[in-house]
Amino acid sequence: YGHQAGDACLAKVAGVMKRSVRTPADLVARYGGEEFVVVLPSSSLNEAALVAERIQTNLRETAMPHAASAVSETVTVSMGITLSTAGDTVTGIIARADEALYRAKQQGRNRWVKLNPLPGV
């Protein structure tokens, strides 16, 4: 994608994500470059995983062409999922989500990985 086409593609992805969340209180925001953050207040890892599945299903059904991709002919997303816990900072939460995203990409992309901040849970 060129710059304008890339921005249009990202806007479509954002629209798919916004349609995929649970409530109007859920937040979808671009987080620089090609990354987004989705904040799901008062949700569990399993609820967040359901939203991730819905995002992937809705994006697959939208079938936006991505000819330059080695992963898929259409636009896909990889996602990292985590929870906030007492005493967390925004930086810490983002770092955990980023680690989960990295793991998703290492496992082949077009998938999500959840990273539980609570050991043994």
Give the label of every model feature segment.
Residues 12-23, 41:
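Short regulatory alpha-helical coupling segments
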Residues 9, 37-58, 93:
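Short helix/loop segment flanking the catalytic signature motif in cyclic-nucleotide metabolism enzymes
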Residues 46-52, 82-121:
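Catalytic-core segments of nucleotide cyclases and related cyclic-nucleotide turnover enzymes
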Residues 73-77:
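PAS and PAS-like sensory/regulatory domains
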Residues 27-30:
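A short pre-motif secondary-structure segment
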Residues 37, 78-81:
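Short aromatic/hydrophobic contact patches that present stacked aromatics
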Residues 14-18, 47-65, 98:
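Alpha-helical scaffold within the catalytic cores of cyclic-nucleotide enzymes
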